[in-house]
Amino acid sequence: MAAAAAVRAGVNFTQRLNRISPVCRVCPLLRLNRCTGAAVRRAVDGFSAPSRRLRTSIGVCQSEDSSAPEEDAHAQEHIVNVVYIDRSGRRIPVQARVGDNVLYLAHKHGIDLEGACEASLACSTCHVYVSSGHYDRLPEPEEREDDMLDMAPLLQENSRLGCQIILTPELDGMELTLPKVTRNFYVDGHVPKPH
């Protein structure tokens, strides 16, 4: 929502600049230096800077013909193999990257792990059973996660919330079993889709 407001503010500022000096064809930032008078003051006074709390991310683009073998070896170091076992017992192997979230990874691969609260620790619909060899490699659950797990049906000693599992190289080969049922509260029969 903050990003949309920042974009709207930027568009409005650009429109105001165009009204100041429509003849000027130089960079909009230079138009302020060339134009004078009350019109400039009104345009600048009406502008509000976007929030500094706006979160951004940096993406890295790679070409498809990356032929450097050391890059391929480096990329392989960051691959984590995970197997989801769905409610019918079907095994779904997935290759993931270090740092991936188990809940979002399931959504990306069409696995029916609900996550109704979008990883905000407000439900237990992303409840999974972690394979015994990998459960001890996970960090201890926080108190909030334990509180949500207390509401999960069919709780076991190896139960965790998928939204709180971040993949590390030590978790390579981990198996995550989806419980037969989850508990979510629906209003008027509405069943939300995974996000």
Swiss-Prot record:
Chief location bin: mitochondrion
Gene3D superfamilies, per the entry: 3.10.20.30
Protein's name according to its UniProt entry: Ferredoxin-2, mitochondrial
Binding site for [2Fe-2S] cluster: C117, C123, C126, C163
Similarity comment text for this entry: Belongs to the adrenodoxin/putidaredoxin family.
A Gene Ontology BP annotation from the UniProt entry: electron transport chain
PANTHER family assigned to the protein according to its UniProt record, in alphabetical order: FERREDOXIN-2, MITOCHONDRIAL, FERREDOXIN/ADRENODOXIN
Top-level taxon: Eukaryota
Limits of the 2Fe-2S ferredoxin-type domain: 81-182
CDD domains (UniProt xref): fer2
Cofactor dependency: [2Fe-2S] cluster
Subcellular location: Mitochondrion; Mitochondrion matrix
Quaternary structure, from the entry: Component of the mitochondrial core iron-sulfur cluster (ISC) complex composed of NFS1, LYRM4, NDUFAB1, ISCU, FXN, and FDX2; this complex is a heterohexamer containing two copies of each monomer. Form a heterodimer complex with NFS1.
GO molecular function: 2 iron, 2 sulfur cluster binding; electron transfer activity; metal ion binding
Source organism per UniProt: Danio rerio (Zebrafish)
InterPro entries: 2Fe-2S_ferredoxin-like_sf (IPR036010), 2Fe-2S_ferredoxin-type (IPR001041), Adrenodoxin-like (IPR001055), Adrenodoxin_Fe-S_BS (IPR018298), Beta-grasp_dom_sf (IPR012675)
Annotated cofactor note: Binds 1 [2Fe-2S] cluster.
Transit peptide location on this chain: 1-61
Keywords: 2Fe-2S, Electron transport, Iron, Iron-sulfur, Metal-binding, Mitochondrion, Transit peptide, Transport
Gene Ontology CC, one term: mitochondrial matrix
Its job: Electron donor, of the core iron-sulfur cluster (ISC) assembly complex, that acts to reduce the persulfide into sulfide during [2Fe-2S] clusters assembly on the scaffolding protein ISCU. The core iron-sulfur cluster (ISC) assembly complex is involved in the de novo synthesis of a [2Fe-2S] cluster, the first step of the mitochondrial iron-sulfur protein biogenesis. This process is initiated by the cysteine desulfurase complex (NFS1:LYRM4:NDUFAB1) that produces persulfide which is delivered on the scaffold protein ISCU in a FXN-dependent manner.
